[in-house]
Curated annotation (Swiss-Prot):
Known role: Transmembrane (T) component of an energy-coupling factor (ECF) ABC-transporter complex. Unlike classic ABC transporters this ECF transporter provides the energy necessary to transport a number of different substrates.
Quaternary data: Forms a stable energy-coupling factor (ECF) transporter complex composed of 2 membrane-embedded substrate-binding proteins (S component), 2 ATP-binding proteins (A component) and 2 transmembrane proteins (T component). May be able to interact with more than 1 S component at a time.
TM segment ranges: 26-46, 47-67, 69-89, 116-136, 151-171, 192-212, 246-266
Keywords: Cell membrane, Membrane, Transmembrane, Transmembrane helix, Transport
Keyword Cell membrane: yes
Source organism (scientific name): Heliobacterium modesticaldum (strain ATCC 51547 / Ice1)
Lineage: superkingdom: Bacteria
GO terms under cellular component: plasma membrane
Membrane topology: Multi-pass membrane protein
Compartments, record wording: Cell membrane
Secreted recorded as keyword: no
Protein name according to UniProt: Energy-coupling factor transporter transmembrane protein EcfT
Pfam families according to UniProt: CbiQ
Amino acid sequence: MLKDITLGQYVPLDSPVHRLDPRTKVIATLLFSIALFLLPTLRSVTLAGLPIIIAIVATRLPIHYILRGIKPLWIFIVFTLLVHLLSTPGETAVRLGPFAITWEGLRQGAMVSQRLIWLYAATSLLTLTTSPIALTDGLELLLSPGKRIGLPVHEFAMMTSIALRFIPTLIEETEKIMKAQSSRGADFDSGSLVARVKSLVPLMVPLLLSAFRRADELAMAMEARCYRGGEGRTRMRPLVMSGKDYAVTVAVSGVFILICLWKKAL
């Protein structure tokens, strides 16, 4: 299941979404994420998936690759759905012994589940279509006004990029540790859910040690290349927003404003 996580991975393709400026994609992802939690009805949240589907088609990424990335969320989504089904008061739809499933619980559970799916898909699309270097440069340029008040903008952008880049690295490291422990008799696939969770506890120490080792190696590599933060740093390929970038930014911002103004009517 861990190998199915696509968050933090980058797939180099030539698509309209890949060619967009990273600032455009960051702004679109941020506004979409906020709007997703402003939408008040199940119908509006369901329709919010339409731009995600259009974006997936435009990226030219295999559909099964996107669906595979959502697979690790299913346990959390099912748990969230059950919590809303069993704890939300309202008109009873089905009664299962002492538990009553309400229509309101069905609506709330479906809304929250869809929000999680669309949010994960939007964030994954950002990292799948944007290289770590471009994402770092885009975040730094977006946050550059913060330099005037002394905020460490470059360092924040660099940390965010490294954190996203390390997600697939740590997943790969976890799989290696699990295979090594399985060869020594460890069992991660059988037993109840609680037993499976407990079996993952012995992974934490070697995984943390591996993460610290990789962080130390990265720090040494950056120092060997005379990295001293963003002061005086130039870019080989400066980011320049095209007409398409401005059009997408204006369109996304316009839809976001309309949602904020008329969310009660949706």
